[in-house]
Amino acid sequence: MAKSSMKAREAKRAKLVAKFAEKRLALKAIISSPTTSDEDRWDAVLKLQALPRDSSSARQRNRCSQTGRPHGFLRKFGLSRIKLREATMRGEVPGLRKASW
């Protein structure tokens, strides 16, 4: 079980990413555009650097929705491998069962 502070930190990051997503996208479009002048590009780079560090989606970490475990996370289910196995054995995941061949 992850510390509640780590779960809260990830929730805060998710909120910041959502808040600054449009602004980051607009600045990145200015930076990557070949028609932008060097001065405008440099201003956009400085503005992008001034945004909060946690507003970048690359700083988010996928975590298990039940335990907060960061490793062994399966994106399709939103659970860690351990909790997915437990739920599968209880028959709570439709269409998923233990392999046997």
Curated annotation (Swiss-Prot):
Gene3D superfamilies: 1.10.287.1480. One of its GO terms (cellular component) is cytoplasm. Disulfide bonds: none annotated. Keywords: Ribonucleoprotein, Ribosomal protein, RNA-binding, rRNA-binding. One of its GO terms (molecular function) is rRNA binding. NCBIfam families: PRK08881.1. This is Small ribosomal subunit protein uS14. The gene is rpsN.
